[in-house]
């Protein structure tokens, strides 16, 4: 049976896990690391994902994409080497890398996954994540909120009743969820967050500070230099991480730029106090959603049993201090903030496949859902923090006499006016019999599934005519678009496979040239010179092929040389066998003499007796 993997598709890093022997286990990637940078690049037509993509970002910033998760569910496009890609396609490339690493670990094909998203992701962003999975060749069995997944991993072995606050500050998003845990029962009471707040923003304030200080000193604006920007970004991220463990760090970027007077170097000390001053507003921004979640759950900080920190950015001391001050509790540090979400996704995968028993998960919708009504008012049908799956219906009517159609404008958010909320989509219900306004009965029904994805239905109760819509992401990807992207992804995977095969054949050919030269030196005088000349000619043919880029030429030349070397090896083996046989015959002729010697020894011993 095919295994189901759990994936934390993160803004800056991603992680994949699977259930092994009843326990969730993180799968290391091909590079041996437990997390994979969510970075995609193209270089000379080759697609690079993960650690290798991150390493080359400084020299190839225009064709490298970072933090694509921040654009999920939008119409944003990335142009890489002249080709345009949607956020779903870029995310699918990351998912394909995680899928391949999981398949290498498990030794079998993987076609199904549970993928996590920020709790505060809206419907478009959730649908976009499912689309990315489909493009990557994965059936997404469930979309799980990241804080909920973290609580699943944390609460697996806990039997006592607990009320926990999950504080999840990742690379690009922030979520806070309040859950009640009770021996396998996980119920989300409230969730809140900010999809535009994360570790990237902490990096940016350091970056902006470095740019400002450098401009003061040298009069050069580094924000206009793409390559310098990438170096600054990496240095800012490293400084941020360093300051979680030390009080001061040195940022050194030699040859960051140059002017008429020569090269310029950036050398600066950054203290933790200065970093906290620069990022104070960001830390304070995490407190708003935290207060809101507690308020929605009807709880006070003193009623919390535990605070769980999730996401790499929760390692920042000021963040830990802020949540400790607000809740009055020392945050729990018994989980790895980089891995716990993927582990929770694997647990949910286990629940869906039946490998994990006695776990019940009740999640909530993060934002209110409704429609636009007369005057541009947002009329809510489902309030935020409603347990999902759920459905709700309400009857509306026409706004004008003899109105024969109505447009249903579906929205998600908390503002009073429709225009201030997130538009999820529009659809029309037509052929309504003409009647005075207020007479037709239009029933609008919302269904939210366990993934948090919305289906809307409008029905004319008079005629029974019905219209449905499944909300799709704002990227506007149709089924045909997704199918085309799936095929493109498959072709890319095949191209990657061929490219890998070509590299391997080239390496094998190079190695064969080296071993041939070594072998021919060793066999001089032992085989005919004609055979040595033939091998040398074949070796030179391989070397010439390696100078070019014709894969078939390299492969053919390599195979020819390999066959010649094999024939030489067989002859050497036969010669060695004949020589051994000749030596063996001589030894047999001496055996009787050896027996006589032994007998003589025994005779001497007997004489002494």
From Swiss-Prot:
Where are the Phosphothreonine modifications? 173
Checking InterPro entries in the record gives: ATPase_NBD, Chaperone_DnaK, Heat_shock_70_CS, HSP70_C_sf, HSP70_peptide-bd_sf, Hsp_70_fam
Q: Where is the composition biased (Acidic residues)?
A: 598-609
Q: Which GO terms describe its molecular function?
A: ATP binding; ATP-dependent protein folding chaperone; unfolded protein binding
This entry's comment on induction and repression of expression is: By stress conditions e.g. heat shock.
**Pfam families under this entry?**
HSP70
Record's keyword terms, sorted: ATP-binding, Chaperone, Nucleotide-binding, Phosphoprotein, Stress response
Q: Where is this region: Disordered?
A: 580-609
Report the function annotation for this chain.
Acts as a chaperone.
Recorded family membership: Belongs to the heat shock protein 70 family.
Q: NCBIfam families under this entry?
A: PRK00290.1, prok_dnaK
UniProt protein name? Chaperone protein DnaK
Name its species.
Brevibacillus brevis (strain 47 / JCM 6285 / NBRC 100599)
């Amino acid at each position: 049976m095919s295994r189901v993997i759990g994936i934390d598709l993160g803004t800056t890093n991603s992680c994949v896990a699977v259930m092994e022997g009843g326990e969730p286990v993180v799968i290391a990637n091909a590079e041996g690391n437990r997390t994979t940078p969510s970075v995609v690049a193209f270089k000379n037509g080759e697609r690079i994902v993960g650690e290798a993509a991150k390493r080359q970002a400084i020299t190839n910033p225009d064709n490298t994409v970072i933090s694509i998760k921040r654009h999920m569910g939008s119409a944003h496009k990335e142009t890489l080497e002249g080709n345009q890609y949607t956020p779903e396609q870029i995310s699918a490339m990351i998912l394909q890398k995680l899928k391949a690493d999981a398949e290498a670990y498990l030794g079998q094909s993987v076609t199904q996954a549970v993928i996590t998203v920020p709790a505060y992701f809206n419907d478009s962003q959730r649908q976009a994540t499912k689309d990315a999975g489909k493009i990557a060749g994965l059936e997404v069995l469930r979309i799980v909120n990241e804080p909920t997944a973290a609580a699943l991993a944390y609460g697996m072995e806990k039997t006592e009743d607990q009320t926990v606050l999950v504080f999840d500050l990742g690379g690009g998003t922030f979520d806070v969820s309040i859950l009640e845990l009770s021996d396998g029962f996980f119920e989300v009471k409230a969730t809140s967050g900010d999809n535009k707040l994360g570790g990237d923003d902490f990096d940016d304030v350091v970056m902006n500070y470095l740019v400002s200080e450098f401009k003061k000193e040298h009069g050069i604006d580094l924000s206009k230099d793409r390559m310098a920007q990438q170096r600054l970004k990496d240095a800012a991220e490293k400084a941020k991480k360093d300051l979680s463990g030390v009080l001061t760090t040195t940022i050194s970027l030699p040859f960051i730029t140059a002017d008429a007077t020569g090269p310029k170097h950036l050398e600066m000390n950054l203290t933790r106090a200065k970093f906290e001053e620069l990022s104070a507003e960001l830390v304070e921004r995490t407190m708003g959603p935290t207060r809101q979640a507690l308020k929605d759950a009807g709880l006070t900080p003193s009623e919390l049993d535990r605070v769980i920190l999730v996401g790499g950015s929760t390692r920042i001391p000021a963040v830990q201090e802020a949540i400790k001050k607000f809740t009055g509790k020392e945050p729990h540090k018994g989980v790895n903030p980089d891995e716990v979400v993927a582990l929770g996704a694997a647990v949910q995968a286990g629940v869906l496949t039946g490998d994990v028993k006695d776990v019940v998960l009740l999640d909530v919708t993060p934002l209110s859902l409704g429609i636009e009504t007369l005057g541009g008012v947002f009329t809510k049908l489902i309030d935020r923090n409603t347990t999902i799956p759920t459905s709700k219906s309400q009857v509306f009517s026409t706004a004008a006499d003899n109105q024969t159609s109505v447009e249903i404008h579906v929205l998600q958010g908390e503002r009073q006016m429709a225009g201030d909320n997130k538009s999820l989509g529009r659809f029309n219900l037509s052929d309504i019999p003409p009647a005075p306004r207020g007479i037709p009965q239009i029933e609008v029904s919302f269904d939210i599934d366990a993934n948090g994805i919305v289906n809307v239905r409008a029905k004319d109760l008079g005629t029974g005519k019905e219209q449905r819509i499944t909300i799709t992401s704002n990227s506007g990807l149709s089924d045909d678009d997704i199918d085309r992207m799936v095929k493109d992804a498959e072709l890319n995977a095949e191209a990657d496979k061929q490219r890998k095969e070509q590299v391997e054949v080239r390496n094998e050919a190079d190695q064969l040239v080296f071993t041939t030269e070594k072998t021919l030196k060793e066999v001089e005088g032992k085989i005919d010179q004609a055979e040595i000349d033939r091998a040398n000619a074949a070796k030179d043919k391989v070397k010439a092929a390696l100078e070019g880029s014709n894969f078939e030429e390299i492969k053919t030349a390599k195979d020819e040389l390999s066959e010649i070397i094999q024939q030489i090896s067989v002859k050497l083996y036969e010669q060695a066998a004949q020589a051994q046989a000749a030596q063996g015959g001589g030894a047999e002729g001496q055996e009787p003499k050896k027996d006589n010697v032994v007998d003589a020894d025994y005779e001497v011993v007997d004489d002494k007796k």
